[in-house]
C-alpha cells in the first residue's frame, strides 16, 4: 500500500524530543502511514515539530505530491542544511558561533580553545583594544632590550585580552540577550541571509504536506477537525512549557488564557502566519497606546 491510499486500520502515535528527531521520525512515519491512518498524534519538544508535520501529512494524504510523499523528503532537506536554518540575530552572531564551536570540538581542552578563538573573531574590536596596551609595551621593551618590561607587556596583553572579552560577553548578556528574549536564533530568515530560517522552512513544510498552495491560508487545528474527502478528524496535541510559570501546557488550549503581542511575534513567525492570526483573532482590550498590539488567538471553529 502507498502512503496516498486510505488504510483500513488506524493508530495513535506520540513522539518525544531528541536531536535525531528531524531525521528519524519522518521516515518512520512514512513507513507507518503505509499501513495505518494516524488518528491521534502527540509530541513534545522536537517531537512536537514532527507531530505537527505528521498531522499535516495525514490531512494531505489524498492530495498528489503532498501528504507523506512530501514528508519523505525531509531528511534530505534537514541533514545538509540544518546549521543554515538556525540563523542568529545579528548582534548575537558571536555568541552563536561560540556555541557552534563548542559543539564541534572534541574534549574539554579543545572546546575551551575553540570557544576562545570564536570569541576573538566575533568581538575583534574588543579583543584589539584589550591586547593593544600590552603589545605596545612589549614592542617598546623589545626595541629597548628591556626584557623585564617585555615579559610585563606580554602578560599585560594576555590579561587585557581576557578582560576585554569577559567585558564584551557580559555586555552581550546584559544588553543584547534581553531584547532577543534570551534566545540566539529567532527562527525566521535574518537580514543578509539567503536560505530560509527554521521556522520559515517548517511553516512551508506544513503547508506543502497539507496540499496547500502559495497564498492559501495556514493549516489550522480547525482544518484538522474536517480533513478532505470526508476523512475522520485528526486529533493533534503538543506539550510545551511555560518557563515563567514553571509548568507544562497542552496545545491547543481551550480558553483565552494567553494573548500574543504583534511586535514580538513579528520577530519569530513568518508574515503569512502572523497576518492570519491578526485577521482571525480578537483584539485584547487595553487602555493605552498599545491598543492594537495584543490579540487573542482565533477560535478553533472559525479557522476552517
Cite the ranges covered by each PLM segment:
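Extended, Lys/Arg-enriched charged tracts that mediate electrostatic binding to polyanionic substrates
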Residues: 203-226, 234-235
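Internal catalytic domains of large membrane-associated glycosyltransferases
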Residues: 11-15, 69, 194, 215-223, ...
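A short, basic/flexible loop-to-alpha-helix module at the beginning of a structural domain
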Residues: 1-5
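Alpha-helical segment proximal to the catalytic Tyr-Lys
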Residues: 233-236, 240-304
